[in-house]
Amino acid sequence: MKILSRRDVLKAANALAVGGVFAAAARAAAPPAEAITPALVEAARREGKVVLYSSMDLPVGEKLGKAFEAAYPGITIQIERSGSERLFQRIAQEFDSNIHAADVINSSDAAHFIPWKRNGWLMPFVSEDIAKYFPENYRDGDGMFATSRVWLSSIAYNSSLVKPEDAPKSYADLLDPKWAGKMVKGHPAYSGTIMTATFQLVRELGWDYFEKLSKQRVMQVQSSTDPPKKLSLGERAVMADGNEYGVVLLKEAGQPVEPVYATEGTPTISGPTGIFASAPHPNAAKLFQGWLHTRQTQQFFIDFTAQYSVHGQVVSKAGRRKISDIKLMKEDPSGVEAMSEEIKTKYAKLFRV
């Protein structure tokens, strides 16, 4: 089996549309919804563990893992965390070497699921909650994956270094010479979040925006989780992109950071989760997938991580801005795939990284 490049995804682009909107044409093949039964729990306990590959923040993953282990004593969870683009290559290399270590995969680049499904790498599984409470455009028609979380890549600023009236209000404002040497951003070749955000910004603003931004002496970091941290430490005054939820959590913890929802719109990212057909612990994987998409766990994502959920029964945490009140940029994972190599090449040339 060959190692997949991002271009391989294009072969499946007409068969699927993933990430904010899944293909409606592929409906009717999903398996019957499965409940979390005592028999499933017992089978999972016999397997003893579940291995999750994920791009979610390590503290979030650890909190999630502890909650799962508390809910199902006797089953441990091993979380392998990395940037989505790195995970994409790692999984391809492992499959090429006939290594099947992962049970469950969660990615911040929804388009990764296109080649995984196309190559038969995913196991169909639909939990009761996914079937009942997840909109069709946020779950695969064949039951291979569902959107576990939604988040944003926003602008932000350090309120100890920047007055509210002086803070940027738009992406165009980031091009003001006064922000030169004062900004930080993530890298699209490492982070699926930043890859998706970069595509949406190129689509809306053109490469001209990034050409001008690259002249602003921006601090370059890898993960989308890094810019909020640099911001809170005062290493830079403004965040050009990065996880909005990281900023929200830091602000709630008393750090001097403030998110900005740009007038042009804010990039939106979906993070689906699926089970590998080759999962060494298939019952534990099903149990985790079912548990992950329950109302209680989805509420956890909202309350603890400041991300968003499409589960029909969850509610926004008091005091936080609702996603419906934010102007959003539209997701288009097939478009990301069509431009991914161009984005990597041009970005590296412009930012010299």
Explain the meaning of each model-derived region.
Residues 54-65, 77-95, 100-228, 232-235:
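Extracytoplasmic ligand-binding site segments that recognize negatively charged/polar headgroups
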Residues 1-17:
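N-terminal secretory signal peptides and thylakoid transit peptides that target proteins
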Residues 150-152, 179-189, 211-214, 220-221, 253-279, 292-316:
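Periplasmic-binding protein-like
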Residues 297, 317-353:
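Extracellular/periplasmic bilobal clamshell ligand-binding domains
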Residues 34-45, 49-51, 55-74:
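Short, polar/charged alpha-helical segment
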Residues 154-161, 198-199, 269-281, 300-301:
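A bilobed periplasmic-binding-protein/Venus flytrap-type ligand-binding module shared by bacterial periplasmic
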Residues 111-115, 237-256:
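A ligand-binding cleft/hinge motif common to bilobed small-molecule-binding domains
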